[in-house]
Amino acid sequence: MNAINWKKLLLPNIPYLFFVYLFDKVGQAVRLSPGADLSGKVLSLGEGFSMAFANPLPSFAPMDLLIGIAGAVLIRLMVYFKGKNAKKYRKGIEYGSARWGTAEDIKPYTDPVFQNNVLLTQTERLTMNSRPKQPKYARNKNILVIGGSGSGKTRFFVKPNLMQMHSSYVVTDPKGTVLVECGKLLQRGGYRIKVLNTINFKKSMKYNPFAYLRSEKDILKLVNTLIANTKGDGEKAGEDFWVKSERLFYCALIGYIWYEAPEEEKNFTTLLEMINASEAREDDPEFQSPVDLTFERLEEKDPEHFAVRQYKKFLLSAGKTRSSILISCGARLSPFDIKELRDLMETDEMELDTIGDRKTALFVIISDTDDTFNFVVSILYTQLFNLLCDKADNEYGGRLPVHVRCLLDEFANIGQIPKFEKLIATIRSREISASIILQSQSQLKAIYKDNADTIAGNCDTTLFLGGKEKTTLKEMSEILGKETIDSFNTSENRGREVSHGLNYQKLGKQLMTEDEIAVMDGGKCILQLRGVRPFFSDKYDITKHPNYKYLSDYDKKNTFDMEKHLRRRPALVKPDEPFDYYEISEADLQEDTDHE
């Protein structure tokens, strides 16, 4: 049983001791008043009060005490029932208390140093400090940005935040325009520039997912991401059995490559060669392909090997079934038939695990019209989040030294990042944040289904730049809430005599209705921060930023030349490959820079 809270029980009733005293004195006054009957005592009650209050102490006569206690109990019951039946009035907010936020509302969430903020609107900013002096003002830096085509997602959100230069950045860059316009600025700020270009492989740095495999768990994550974002063979590709069989086969081959292959062969090219060397014959159950023989030798060497255990499960299927699985695997990895893609993923220059160590800007250039190679981007983001979380936990006590902001423009075109709904809930404490940029909320639901609401719920900030998609408009209007407005009606009755009437009343109205949001001025936006009233503000004016003069928007001389940047990067030299070595003085390097 719960212990009685005497403090809570007694403190509210202390004032009623006064009524015990008061009624006790009344009882004493009546008792001391002269008179043989009640009417006589009432007439001389004044004299009785004089005698009763001659001594300020309460009367301890039993009847006086009883009257005192009874009177106090009566008053307590009257107060109780009056409070219980009291009408609750909320004057001015009867139908809703929604209103637009003010400068005072956002002030506790803003850093006084301009550069230490996330830029949201022209007047609202959010501090990058994840541990403010008052914990109640702490907000994660995950942001959901929604804006239809042409609403300015890049100009009014991505570019202003790149100009802040307070973090490492991972930017999804449709068409590659952000890199061209902001690259020189970031170089000036001391950033390393990394580029993965899935539109033009020749203008990309190398990315090899095998370089980031640290354990068997990483192999499973790589396989799951690959399967989630590629297509197998026809109808069978979507069936659970075939997908599970493919997963076993991929895990076996990648496990073998990771454990047994030389360093220079740990890539997708080797995986394709092993798949091409695999064969299953329905009419010859005893037939063994070169891959079968390879795993047989490995089993003799280590029967408990991860790759062997996976491959033996794969071999449990019949020859005809294995043949179908191999066809599906070939179809799924058909993009790797392109030599440029194989070359791109042969070695690695991305250094994904170091992005949280020093200021780095990684630009992921994707096509906004073709998603053929977006599975590569999905693999990169999956590995990036896992690598950074592991490094924060294992090397930095849970927090990266440099915050990593992922500006995920055209998030719907990236593909599916497995378990993203869990990642976005946990990356905050590691000094990682994600800005999910969409054209409409329905895009998120199309990819992540039931987990879309979980992902959106883990974004403390929502920025709506404009759009006309019905679901988004409805949700925005509902979240803004209702305000209470005054209304009056006039009436006119015509009969023998004309009479007029005027009726005032209060009504509830959405702070902004769906149609009002749909026709919102192109220079306005709606900002919602958890625990704060929404803001109806101007979009950020990029030309007012102190670093705007370093963008190519301001001066074409600031245009970033990706090809020149790639030529300057250190060459990748394979083992035993001859190469030339030169020494360049600092003066020569400065002279070359001046000529540019």
Region spans (language model):
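Basic- and hydrophobic-enriched, low-structure N-terminal and domain-boundary segments
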Residues: 1-151, 155-158, 482, 493, ...
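P-loop NTPase motor domains
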Residues: 25, 139-432, 447, 457, ...
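General secondary-structure edge motif
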Residues: 98, 125, 129, 141-142, ...
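A short glycine-/small-residue-rich loop at the edge of a beta-strand within enzyme catalytic domains
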Residues: 107-109, 114, 375, 411, ...
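Conserved long hydrophobic alpha-helices within structured protein cores
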Residues: 113-120, 375-383, 476
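Low-complexity, polar-biased intrinsically disordered regions enriched in Pro/Ser/Thr/Gly
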Residues: 126-132, 231-241, 486-505
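Short secondary-structure boundary micro-motifs
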Residues: 128, 153-154, 223, 337, ...
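Conserved ATP-driven motor cores of ASCE-family P-loop NTPases powering translocation/secretion/packaging/pilus
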Residues: 424-526
